[in-house]
């Protein structure tokens, strides 16, 4: 697992149109020691924030108005490019097999269904961030 000192350097972008969901996710992340957290209620701003913030992990809701998580997942995956790995974790209340398959096919690295177990969620976040760090180290 990652050393605690590495947590403060990791940047997390959380995109969800529900303020209560953002608050819960941020509370769990902050409790785990993450401090570089950006949140977005409006998925239309996600590409701009992604490019400016350069996150190490994106946490993305699927069911949002106007621009849904699937369309955004596709856009963000194309922005990362082939020579970079920015994992995307999907957070969704949709437990259908179709939703999971579609999100994974579009590039999601993990899927967590709401409501989620906070301990499991924290472990999954840490695992994806460790993957990101290993990828960055390998590129050096």
Spell out what each predicted region is.
Residues 98, 116-129:
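C-terminal output helix
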Residues 20, 42-45, 63, 68-74:
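Acidic catalytic/metal-coordinating carboxylates
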Residues 16, 61, 92:
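Active-site residues of response regulator receiver
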Residues 23-27, 71, 84, 95-110:
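Alpha4 helix (beta4-alpha4-beta5 surface) of REC/receiver domains from two-component response regulators
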Residues 39, 65-66, 92, 96, ...:
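The feature encodes the CheY-like receiver
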Residues 48, 70-83:
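Short amphipathic alpha-helix used as the core "switch/output" element in two-component signaling
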Residues 19-38:
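Two-component/phosphorelay signaling modules centered on CheY-like receiver
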Residues 39-57:
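Acidic, metal-coordinating helix/loop segments flanking the phosphotransfer/catalytic sites
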